[in-house]
Amino acid sequence: MTEQVSETEYRSRLMDGMAAAVAEKGYAETTIADIVRLARVSKRTFYEHFASKEDCLLALYTAATDQLIEVIRQAIESAHDMHSRVRCAHRAYLQRIKAHPLLMRTLFIEILAAGSRGLQVRRAANQRFADLLRATGADQHYDSPQKRQITPALAMAIVGGINELILQAMESDQIDQLLLIEEPATALLEAVLARTVAED
């Protein structure tokens, strides 16, 4: 019996193939032939879903971002106070990255090889993380109006700082030590959330 594969499954396999190929050869050296070989599909199937390998990489980046956002959101919703939310969110984020090191290295580093479009989707992803951070801070402000709200610029600075620590761990092949970032990342965000309006 011939296996019936849905269009969603084909797309998922192609993105998995992209992730595996880039992890093995780097984005610049990856070809569409590499992607379809690892995805076990034809080139025709590839072009039915993506116009180019760049489009495939950008789709992979966006899908992985969606998954990370959902993991963090679930961690936040499972916590009962602000301290727990902050710690659980950082832990979930770092554990997800540690569990998928090759994919995350592709996304953190290789996305830059996609040029201006890569920067655009990376910036959009960082904005989504910053928005989630601000929403978490807004919950605290609702409960404690004297607490200072997180501005858009401050949220982006926090996201950028934490991601830079992650990038350093990746570049120095210390992904196994990634959870050590949890403490400074949590301390940074808690310090920001602890500020009161009177301190401005």
Segments and roles (model prediction):
Residues 16, 83-98, 156, 160, ...:
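Amphipathic alpha-helical segments that line or abut small-molecule/effector binding pockets
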Residues 1-9, 141-148, 197-200:
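N-terminal intrinsically disordered/low-complexity leader segments
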Residues 59, 74-102, 147:
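Hydrophobic alpha-helical connector segments
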Residues 116-141, 149-164, 180-183, 187:
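Amphipathic alpha-helical packing segments from all-alpha helical-bundle domains
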Residues 98-117, 134-137, 167:
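Amphipathic alpha-helical segments used for helix-helix packing
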Residues 96, 135, 152-176, 188-200:
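Amphipathic C-terminal alpha-helical segment
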Residues 7-18, 35, 60-68:
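Generic hydrophobic, amphipathic alpha-helix propensity
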Residues 13, 21-55, 59:
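Helix-turn-helix
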